[in-house]
């Protein structure tokens, strides 16, 4: 992926009419500890600052503010289709997709993994918020199913998330993934600082899920929101902090 201005853009082979970005923490108006491009309205930041940050984001990608489909994310597996009728409603879901040009699917993260999907014909795009619970619960599977195209025609981009050197989890997390798929064991090692804990690679876990579905083209990954405090918000590092946004949309 490449950095242009205050956003990351995927290095992938999606059709030209597909656009995707992931914001960094730079370029906004929020003060500490949300400095500065906080796009989350649920983190106790000044609502006017969040509104201005969202306006700046929309302007930078040449979309109207009310055409960005913000979600009420709950670490679940619900998927919503975004249309002109609901794009401004902040629907309770952890993934969205759309076939409508000029409407952006958006997910907010600050360590969780944003996963973007697009089909090879440029007819449908989607985005999922993958914390470990939603990822393990099947949010990617639900999104791929809802997009209703052959999975082998999809490609995925993995945005910035907590890296494998910083993502320490309890044994119940490892067990939950392995119960679903024994191959998931390869995404964990026993180097956790606390006894009985493991280090997890959320990029590898998501890639495994995608590959099993038939999505073989997966790009991105390799970043760590915890380690790169200049670029990224991190809940695990800072506690109260802002949120980045990852968006995907179709142009006309």
Residue ranges, per PLM feature:
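Active-site microenvironment for binding and transforming phosphate-containing groups
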Residues: 1-252
